[in-house]
């Protein structure tokens, strides 16, 4: 047998092989077909037991706003923890030295950036820090003295 015929026989089936091929039908083995019907992929199966449904009202009740008036830089981490727990924080920096207040604002700016939140100045030395689940709409305009504006 030539090499050409060997390759031809290897890659294609001869007509003789078709004669011996037998196709099974559902009538030949009905019990196997029923077992296959019972086995469904995991995504096609219906959930069994208790379904976890959360009321939308309970989600809204858990939203909180925390008021914070830090006296030292070390309290900035506590404010960051509130933000990580998805709570909005109003930070009053009026009772802290300017250099410490600036460090706190820098720290909180990094925190809200990391969690996808936002920080906004809402007053003189007062900031609103929000996580990504809180939307703030509107703006507060104020007349700022040149001295106050240069401070930040």
UniProtKB/Swiss-Prot annotation:
Assembly mode: Homodimer. Interacts with FtsZ.
HAMAP family hit by this protein: SepF
GO BP of this protein: division septum assembly; FtsZ-dependent cytokinesis
One GO cellular component, as annotated: cytoplasm
Family statement drawn from the similarity comment of this UniProt entry: Belongs to the SepF family.
Coiled coil: none
Basic and acidic residues composition bias: residue spans: 26-40
Pfam families assigned: SepF (PF04472)
Protein name: Cell division protein SepF
Annotated stretches, region: Disordered: 21-56
Function: Cell division protein that is part of the divisome complex and is recruited early to the Z-ring. Probably stimulates Z-ring formation, perhaps through the cross-linking of FtsZ protofilaments. Its function overlaps with FtsA.
Gene that produces this protein: sepF
Keywords linked to the UniProt accession: Cell cycle, Cell division, Cytoplasm, Septation
Location of the protein in the cell: Cytoplasm
Keyword Protease carried by entry: no
